[in-house]
Amino acid sequence: SGKLYRTATPPMDPAESHLRILPTTTRSDVGLVTNDGIAHAVHVSDLPVSTPGLTTQLPDPESIIGTSQRVVGLISWRSEATYALGTSQGTVKRFTGPLPDKQEVSLIALKELDEVVGIAEAGDDSELTFITNEANILVFPASSVRPQGRGAAGMAGIKLSDGAKAIYFTSLKVTKDTQV
């Protein structure tokens, strides 16, 4: 189950801020992206207020977006940013916002038994990262993945051995201090 909250308190570790914080206002919409590849529009003011680390019970995503799917990421609904998502079968896809005026938008055409494991903002200067259940990691330039339309199926991102799957995907801004 995903952890959903809005707060004025940033996470304790600034290096992880891209995983939890999305600059927004109380009058804007965000997209809660679920493992089935669908972005669900949510008005920021409809998200419960809590303090990370001090709240023992976080809200159930089903009560907010009406689905039992797992929330894997958060995106800005109206931003013209470019995002990348990765799937458990190793597919990667980039697309550019803003998202259309709908309550739900499919972001990727998933293959059978595939699911989204992560989504993040990914400009051309970013590095995309997959981690597998076999402890393999692949880091490659986001610029090597051409942005596609929202209905497209993406492209091969990481080659997986039989029985392996990607369990995590994100985008990193690499600096001279970045260690992977």
Where are the regions that the model predicts?
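Short, structured "edge-of-domain" segments at secondary-structure transitions
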Residues: 1-180
